Amino acid sequence: MHAIASDTLKVCISGQGAELQHIICQHNGLEVLWSGLSNYWSRRAPVLFPVVGRLKNNQFRYNNTWYTLMQHGFARDLKFTLEHLQTHQAMFQLKSSSATREIGRAHV
């Protein structure tokens, strides 16, 4: 978990999906982000990339080749690398890996 802060807010970010985990008001300690109650929905603020929603039959065609892509894409389920962290900013990167290359394989 990585944290950045200002006089107003403190934000905690997970490397898993580069997902925000907490946004806390510095003045009163109030959590302003959904808490991720697992009985309802355990995620908080997932990065939906490269698509928001569901594709017809979970497929898309590019250059006459069909590919499979599940609802909301893949970024939210992969590990991001923290590239830069300062008091007021954090930069994460999703790097090519066997998992990302598998996503790009043609649907047969």
Model-derived features: positions:
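Surface-exposed acidic/polar loop and edge beta-strand patches at domain peripheries
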Residues: 1-105
